[in-house]
Amino acid sequence: MKVLAIFALCIIGALATPCDDFKIMQEAWNTMKNEEVEILYTVFKAYPDIQAKFPQFVGKDLETIKGTAEFAVHATRIVSFMTEVISLLGNPDNLPAIMSLLSKLGKDHKGRGITVKQFDEFHEAFHNFLHTHSVWNDNVDAAWHCNEKEIRKVINANLE
């Protein structure tokens, strides 16, 4: 138990220190966070194995489900979670909340059989969407890369 507490403190410290361009990341996110359906569609299109992990979408034609309320609701859940985490970044007082959210996400997905590889695939498709649907430059890329790296450490630690 002590090891987990020390590990959590190390992750909190990592989230607190290396990335100081939270505003740049948040501004880029704000330009495209309302494209929930397109974000999830892009992920499923790039990685059908991820779609297969969603029981309500297994075996269904992506083009058909894209326009459904069920797809929109689930896409909104995912993007709302991301929005919550991104909005909390940049304030050290929020680190326990961020850790709790990300740890729970990893644990919940581990219980559903999601692997680190699939989270990496999701990240890759999501990142490609960001590049093409938001204001993107070297500063934005650096901010996203640094913050995502730290966020994924927490999620991955709870998936393994």
From Swiss-Prot:
Q: Which residues form the Globin domain?
A: 17-160
Q: What keywords would UniProt list here?
A: Heme, Iron, Metal-binding, Oxygen transport, Signal, Transport
Q: Which InterPro entries match?
A: Erythrocruorin, Globin, Globin-like_sf, Globin/Proto, Mb-like_M
GO CC list: extracellular region; hemoglobin complex
- Top-rank taxon of the source lineage equals Eukaryota
- Which positions in this protein are listed as binding heme b? H74, H109
Question: Which residues are the signal sequence here?
Answer: 1-16
Tell me which CDD domains the record gives: Mb-like (cd01040)
GO terms of molecular function: heme binding; metal ion binding; oxygen binding; oxygen carrier activity
Q: What else is known?
A: There are at least 12 different components in Midge globin.
Which PANTHER family does the entry mention? GLOBIN-LIKE PROTEIN
* Family listed: Belongs to the globin family.
* Name of the protein described by the UniProt record: Globin CTT-Y
Q: Which organism is it from?
A: Chironomus thummi piger
Give the lineage: Eukaryota, Metazoa, Ecdysozoa, Arthropoda, Hexapoda
Gene designation: CTT-Y
